[in-house]
């Protein structure tokens, strides 16, 4: 079992980003943080890097359940979703698989939450389609 779900689609980076945010919203997630690694690495290290964005996605009801089940789970929140351009109009979108990332935590209530969140994030990835 991989620690992430992933799919590569054809389309403009910005268009795919909008689609991902819409799919996340449809699954009950909000994007709390956005990190533009291309810009950050250019500004901080003066290094060129491909388009690469990290979206910190949170589903508040599930986050609340997870925090009730395990008070240190905040160290693993939010769920990261990344977009990266491997070549022109070839965009890979990946999302964390919470089932794998939370395997080390022995908590039955948390496992149920992780299964539900994993299913929703996998749905986001599976519903991505090539730009038309």
Regions found by a protein language model. Give the residues of each.
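Conserved active-site and cofactor/substrate-binding residues in soluble primary-metabolism enzymes
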Residues: 11, 15, 36, 112, ...
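Short Gly/charged-rich anion-binding patches and loops
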Residues: 18-19, 36, 69, 120
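Short glycine-enriched loop/turn motifs at secondary-structure junctions
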Residues: 1-3, 25, 47-50, 86
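Terminal, regulation- and interaction-focused segments at domain boundaries
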Residues: 1-27, 126
